[in-house]
C-alpha cells in the first residue's frame, strides 16, 4: 500500500506541473493556438488545457496510471486528487484575474477623480501585478500541502498520520 501511495504522490505532483503548464498556456495569448477563425478565443476547454507536449491532462493521467500499474482503487484516488487540484488552480487564476480587474477599475476611478496621477497609478500597478503574478504563493502552497496530507491520511488508512504538515 505504501509503494502505491508513493507512486500516487509522484503521479499527482507530475500532473500538477502539467496542469500549471496548461494553465499558463491558456492564460498566455502568445502560446494559445488560434482556432479556426484565427482569433485564439472561444476554444474548447479540452484544447485550452493542452500540456506543453500537446497532450491533454486526461491523457497524462491515463499514461501515469498505465505506467505505474496502479490498482483501480488507487487510480480512482489519483484522479480525484488531480481533479480537485486542477479545480483549485483554475479557481485561483480566476480570482487573480478578478483582482487585477478590480485594481484597474479602482485606479481608473482615482485617476478620473484627480486623486492620483498617471505616474502614481503606474507605479502601484506594477507592484500590484508583480505581487499577484506568482502561482506558488506561500499561502497557496501550504494550503495544497495541507489538503494533500489530509487526503493521504484519510485514504492511506492512517499510515501517514505522523507526517508533519505546517499550516501556518
Swiss-Prot record:
Signal peptide: 1-22
Entry keyword set: Glycoprotein, Host Golgi apparatus, Secreted, Signal, Virulence
Region of interest (Disordered), ranges: 25-52
Domain IQ, first and last residues per copy: 78-107
Subcellular location: Secreted; Host Golgi apparatus
Primary subcellular site in the record, as a coarse category: secreted
Regions of compositional bias (Polar residues) in chain numbering: 32-50
GO terms for cellular component: extracellular region; host cell Golgi apparatus
Induction: Expression is up-regulated in spores.
RxLR-dEER, short sequence motif: residues: 46-63
Sites where a glycan is attached: 37, 42, 105
Family to which this protein belongs: Belongs to the RxLR effector family.
Its biological purpose: Secreted effector that suppresses pattern-triggered immunity (PTI) in plant host.
Record remark on domains: The RxLR-dEER motif acts to carry the protein into the host cell cytoplasm through binding to cell surface phosphatidylinositol-3-phosphate.
Protein name: Secreted RxLR effector protein RXLR-C06
Gene: RXLR-C06
Amino acid at each position: 500500500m505504501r509503494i502505491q501511495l508513493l507512486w500516487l504522490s509522484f503521479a499527482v505532483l507530475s500532473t500538477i506541473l502539467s496542469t500549471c503548464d496548461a494553465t499558463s498556456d491558456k492564460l498566455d495569448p502568445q502560446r494559445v493556438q488560434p482556432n479556426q477563425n484565427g482569433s485564439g478565443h472561444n476554444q474548447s476547454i479540452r484544447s485550452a488545457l493542452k500540456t506543453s507536449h500537446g497532450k491533454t491532462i486526461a491523457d497524462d493521467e491515463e499514461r501515469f496510471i498505465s505506467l505505474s500499474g496502479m490498482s483501480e482503487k488507487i487510480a480512482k484516488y489519483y484522479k480525484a486528487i488531480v481533479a480537485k487540484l486542477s479545480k483549485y488552480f483554475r479557481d485561483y487564476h480566476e480570482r487573480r484575474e478578478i483582482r487585477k480587474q478590480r485594481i484597474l477599475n479602482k485606479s481608473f476611478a482615482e485617476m478620473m477623480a484627480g486623486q492620483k496621477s498617471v505616474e502614481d497609478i503606474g507605479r502601484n500597478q506594477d507592484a500590484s501585478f508583480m505581487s499577484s503574478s506568482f502561482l506558488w504563493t506561500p499561502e497557496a502552497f501550504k494550503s495544497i500541502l495541507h489538503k494533500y496530507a489530509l487526503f493521504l491520511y484519510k485514504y492511506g488508512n492512517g499510515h501517514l498520520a505522523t507526517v508533519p504538515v505546517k499550516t501556518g
